[in-house]
Amino acid sequence: MRVFGWIAPVQVTPVELLVKACWWLAAGMALSAAVCWLVLDLLALPQFTEHSAIIVLLVILWFITLFALTMLFDRMKTLHAIGGLVLLSVIGGLLAASLFSLQLCLVLYGVTGGMFALGALIAHLYGERLRNGRFYWLLAAAGGVLAVVINLALEGDTAQWCTSLFLVVLFSVVSARKSPEMLDSARGLYRQQFVTVQHCATRGALSIWLGAATAFLDILQTLMFLVSSGSSSASR
């Protein structure tokens, strides 16, 4: 007989984990949008649009942050994961503000954040019925519909359409790929120590953010390789 057998951590359920991870990602996107609005509209800092040195500095800071968070991820507690999400959201917002217009920044973060907010509602209402990755198809569909509605309402140009739809696909695919890893991590944490759903959700949200950033860099590197290969072939 186990005297203290009744003392056990709450089982981490997949639906709870999805809902909270989606809300954390939506909150991160909202924070990035707020940073863009603060820099480009409220403070109207000309340095973010006139000086290329700011862009270079933010890109370097972005790479350092990604590398540091990736290396430290396995040892992160709840507050560390939240801090990582806040840091990524703030630096991402500053970098977006240095590269794009305020409208484009708000559209991109609004579409992506709205997609995850809708994903949280979908998971909360129908999560138990969604099997075999159907949740992520619905997540992508919700993001796609949101992107179409917002771009039609704002009469967005081609770049705005393509970028917003690209982010929907990117974050949906990365979320689907990170889902088994996130659930396995939750099971492992449950077996080893006392944990909360919030702990697993913040780590899951951070892993999706890091995965999306890494995937974007891989795509960018591939495109640069293809362009350089094409230009070298043409020069011959």
PLM features: what roles do these ranges have?
Residues 1-236:
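A hydrophobic alpha-helical transmembrane-helix feature that marks the membrane cores
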